[in-house]
């Protein structure tokens, strides 16, 4: 969540932000426009950010007129980039394929926005 919070605290100073398995909670400034491009990389089966929270996040990004993208990885829980994550009961499981894909997407996104 810290990455997404940053777009409200430093929005004028960053070109883009990438969130890996963020919590997608409502922002502290719901009516503020977002000038940074946003890429949220999300595990669709993440119990810490269920589909309704994802939908609310997408609506909020649209209302803020953000240049946003969300990629939801199927069969993927929270902490999918952390090789130490192995607690399906808690909802954190490493997913190597989503880890590799998300890294490629993040580097491509950053290359675009930092151009």
Outline where the language-model segments fall.
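Alpha/beta-hydrolase-fold catalytic nucleophile elbow
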Residues: 18-21, 41, 71-74
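Short, charged, surface-exposed secondary-structure boundary motifs
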Residues: 27-30, 49-53
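Short alpha-helix in the alpha/beta-hydrolase fold that links the catalytic acid
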Residues: 50-60, 69
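Acidic catalytic loop of the alpha/beta-hydrolase fold
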Residues: 45-49, 78
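Primarily recognizes the serine-hydrolase "nucleophile elbow" in alpha/beta-hydrolase
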Residues: 1-34
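Short beta-strand/loop motif that positions the catalytic acidic residue
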Residues: 34, 40-42, 46, 73
